[in-house]
């Protein structure tokens, strides 16, 4: 599902533990780390997509997390030209994302990366809240910064910039 401007609706997930650290996951087959994220399917609300992606990508169920906050609006990033498939119709030029801050309320052993076929991630770790800003691929960095700044005041443990 791509909107009239060429952006694919998507949800981004910042999952925090009791210490204010966030889940940082490595994409399978790549040396690229990111927050879990995924597309919103036709007829889904952002919250429904959030819970579907949470289950598919990291094995968590709604009862394993608490929604703390979400971004007020959509945050957009454009894909680099090398990632744009100009032969597709419609052409996707980027993602528009609704970001959610979640608190893990279950033991971390519930996190499972192997439920999707194929899996999205092959490794994960807890990192400090601001660590991802220096690590994420450049074209996503501005959206990460905007989402993290907007959501940081709602963290279970304060992690102000």
UniProtKB/Swiss-Prot annotation:
PROSITE patterns: NUDIX, NUDIX_BOX
Enzyme nomenclature, EC number: 3.6.1.-
Record domain Nudix hydrolase: where: 6-149
Keyword Hydrolase among UniProt keywords: yes
Segments passing through the bilayer: none
GO molecular function: pyrophosphatase activity
Motif (Nudix box): 38-59
Cofactor(s) this protein requires: a divalent metal cation
Protein family according to the UniProt entry: Belongs to the Nudix hydrolase family. RppH subfamily.
Record's function text: Accelerates the degradation of transcripts by removing pyrophosphate from the 5'-end of triphosphorylated RNA, leading to a more labile monophosphorylated state that can stimulate subsequent ribonuclease cleavage.
Protein name listed in UniProt: RNA pyrophosphohydrolase
Originating species: Acinetobacter baumannii (strain ATCC 17978 / DSM 105126 / CIP 53.77 / LMG 1025 / NCDC KC755 / 5377)
Organism phylogeny: Bacteria, Pseudomonadati, Pseudomonadota, Gammaproteobacteria, Moraxellales
């Amino acid at each position: 599902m791509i909107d009239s401007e060429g952006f694919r609706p998507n949800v981004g997930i910042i999952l925090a533990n009791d210490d204010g650290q966030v889940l940082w996951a490595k994409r399978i087959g790549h040396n690229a780390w990111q927050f879990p994220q995924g597309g919103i399917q036709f007829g889904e609300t952002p919250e429904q997509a959030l819970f579907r992606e949470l289950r598919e990508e990291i094995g968590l169920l709604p009862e394993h997390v608490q929604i703390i906050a979400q971004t007020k609006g959509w945050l957009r990033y454009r894909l680099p030209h090398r990632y744009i498939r100009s032969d597709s119709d419609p052409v996707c030029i980027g993602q528009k994302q609704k970001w959610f801050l979640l608190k893990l309320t279950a033991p971390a052993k519930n996190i499972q990366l192997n439920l999707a076929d194929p899996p999205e991630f092959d490794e994960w770790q807890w990192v400090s809240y601001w660590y991802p800003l220096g690590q994420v691929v450049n074209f996503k960095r501005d959206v990460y910064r905007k989402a993290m700044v907007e959501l940081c005041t709602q963290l279970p443990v304060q992690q102000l910039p």
